[in-house]
Amino acid sequence: MSSPSKRREMDLMKLMMSDYKVEMINDGMQEFFVEFSGPKDSIYEGGVWKIRVELPDAYPYKSPSVGFITKIYHPNVDEMSGSVCLDVINQTWSPMFDLVNVFETFLPQLLLYPNPSDPLNGEAAALMMRDRPTYEQRVKEYCEKYAKPRADTEEMSSDDEMSEDEYASDGDDEDDVAIAGKLDP
């Protein structure tokens, strides 16, 4: 195993052993999803985003590619593709950093200190500079609409499944029989 390959494996294991939920995309160790929570005491607090990470062949000498799968309203994140302004990580990346640094330092810094002068989302950048309270409200609306904590979304889906099961097997069956009886000639 080559040195970059060993390093990739070690960094990925370290990330998996941390508090972050990691979901591999393929059998390899190059692409995966990570759940990332908004920094405390920020307008992003309470939000949980699914982040796609791609490790280049030259990792750790070249920075990972990071993109938001979950929608986020931020000047340095493209709203449609989820791409993060590459300068955020590339300019400061060093092989001394690892994947945990991306989620404990780089992304929190990105959310805490947006740079509206180098935007990927021009609308968010303009709103942030023109009307900060409205910008912050929009961020919170996106958090509420798209970045609900995973536990809440799991509960909602299991409730939805339960209501479908109830519809198919419980009291609604009696209604179905009654309706079917009324419709028969």
UniProtKB/Swiss-Prot annotation:
Region Disordered, residue ranges: 146-185
Biochemical pathway: Protein modification; protein ubiquitination
Recorded coiled-coil stretches: none
EC number: 2.3.2.23
Keyword set includes Kinase: no
Keywords linked to the UniProt accession: ATP-binding, Nucleotide-binding, Transferase, Ubl conjugation pathway
Key word ATP-binding present: yes
Family annotation (Pfam families): UQ_con (PF00179)
Active site, UniProt feature: C85
EC top class named in words: transferase
Catalytic activity: S-ubiquitinyl-[E1 ubiquitin-activating enzyme]-L-cysteine + [E2 ubiquitin-conjugating enzyme]-L-cysteine = [E1 ubiquitin-activating enzyme]-L-cysteine + S-ubiquitinyl-[E2 ubiquitin-conjugating enzyme]-L-cysteine
InterPro entries in the record: UBQ-conjugat_E2_core, UBQ-conjugating_AS, UBQ-conjugating_enzyme/RWD
Domain UBC core: 1-148
Molecular function, one GO term: ATP binding
Family designation: Belongs to the ubiquitin-conjugating enzyme family.
Role noted for this protein: Accepts the ubiquitin from the E1 complex and catalyzes its covalent attachment to other proteins.
The name this protein goes by in its record: Ubiquitin-conjugating enzyme E2 5
